[in-house]
Amino acid sequence: MTNDYQQLNYLVETDDEADIIIANLVKQLNELKEILLSLDNQDLEINQVNHRTTVHNTSSNTSNNSTSNNIADGNYNSNFFHNFSKETLQTQAKRGFLLLERCSLVGLQQLELEYLNVLGRSFESHQDKINFLVNLRDLTNDHLLDTEKIVSTLEQIFNVIGGTEYTPILNSFFNQSLNDPDPIQREIGLKQFVANLRQRFKTLLQKTNNSIQQLEAEIQIPTTHIKSDEVMFGPPDMNERLVLNDSETDAILRSIEAELESALQNKKQVVVTAVPPIAANLATDSISQETLEHNLNNTETVNTTTVTVTSASETQVRKPQISLRPIFQGNFPKRLSREDIQRYAHQLQELEQSNEG
């Protein structure tokens, strides 16, 4: 049994692996279902007459196989199980619960994982994904029907042996209350287990149906809301002039044009008020042609350059903007005055003289 539960410890990575696991579970489900629905041959032979009467089989040549088929089809009632011993019913109850836990529950968990796997997969089209979900829903429905047959058989058995000392200990892996010494608690635990199992089946079917409906709605969106003639690909035809008739758009364009026009007018009205010194000298101080020729011919002429010193107030120097961190005066010693320095010097001189003496 431990090997079967190892399938719960990892997610299915590939679709082929998921199909193999589900196929094996369905095969195992059918095999164990036959084991559950077939009673011991000895009890069948002993109670063959009573059994024929209870099942209401019209055939005069009823065999053991026909009895098993009637049980599989659900053609039996609670009186049928009174024809068998308590020990036989206990054995069938253990088999039935083993079938629920090993196949119904484990198979349901694999179907839930497969549903999550489908949501994360990429398909070539929405229709392929819908078809896969429909197959998953059909498989879940079949699995639920098989589970209901097992549950119905167990309910009939527990109507006979439930609540007494004959209630078997089922040794559940998931529900510890089924291992309780009290038979009543074991019966309650089994009912809770079956109720939770049914609810999980209904939840999975509801999620699958919702996903199918959502995908079908997404397929119809492009055809119902957007027509082919309403879709425009690329820019408009450049041969035709684009005319804006919207009044609000025209007002916005006019305001932009007005702002551009005012900006151009302001740029033309800008007047240079201050002439730089270098530009002023180049504009006023010009050298005549006669003076230039005289200076070139007379090598004794000494060219003098007049340097004008301007004050600091006249020269506008752009100082760098440097932000200095504040200095806390408490971190530094007090500044010494001239008298303090002279006093300390005399003290050092007297100290040296005393050391020499």
From Swiss-Prot:
Give the organism, scientific name.
Answer: Mycoplasma pneumoniae (strain ATCC 29342 / M129 / Subtype 1) (Mycoplasmoides pneumoniae)
Q: Which Pfam families match?
A: MG491_central
From the Swiss-Prot or TrEMBL record, give the protein name.
Answer: Uncharacterized protein MG218.1 homolog
